[in-house]
């Protein structure tokens, strides 16, 4: 939790620099911190009909909750601003940031070379236990210990994410067209349309808890995927070079 809040503090200061002369402009009033997320990626962010101590209203359509919502609320509190969560599809998040529709993307997003061409990222606020595979519990794949055993199998990942990119590390895999959300992939797995779903452990634990017919394949050391599994906050390009942001990174 300390690591989470420290990273949130960095982002808060970066945004303070933005508010005092940076280039971020949003459609909301100056006292509202607008954050974009899918609200479909538990435990990082999800939509619920029930209000909790950590949830944030989504207009008249329920509430946003999760790890990312807590980070967003912390930053808003540090800035002395109101928090507004906008539900945006994964592939629309960075365009919304660039256009000024939102102030930040806090959505379980990993910084990579392509994304850094159009946005600035804070230091990571989360590092997962690594990338794994979700499979049917009663399947042969549940006994696998090496990603190469999925050669010839149908494997799917979420569109526009590292989880889709890494599938090609499996030689001879049938790389299924990626899906927008995990819900679609889970249905495909349960119906036998795919043999495995790439994911990180934090996400997989929630999937398994809700779907006891599924299980997780954790690979032996040196036999798994090679991927960056850290999560950072995306800010509008140029924000991270502000003087206030540089001061915060010394904390």
Each language-model region and where it sits:
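C-terminal motif of bacterial Sec signal peptides marking the signal peptidase cleavage site
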Residues: 12-17
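Extracytoplasmic small-molecule ligand-binding "clamshell" domains
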Residues: 25-109
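Short loop->beta-strand "edge-of-pocket" segments that line small-molecule binding or catalytic clefts
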Residues: 34-35, 54-65, 146-161, 175
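A ligand-binding cleft/hinge motif common to bilobed small-molecule-binding domains
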Residues: 92, 109-118, 166-169, 195-227
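Periplasmic-binding protein-like
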Residues: 127-135, 209-249
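Bacterial signal peptide processing site
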Residues: 19-22
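Acidic, polar ligand-binding/catalytic clefts
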Residues: 82-149
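Short helix-initiation/N-cap motifs at beta->coil->alpha
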Residues: 67-69, 85-95, 142, 177-191, ...
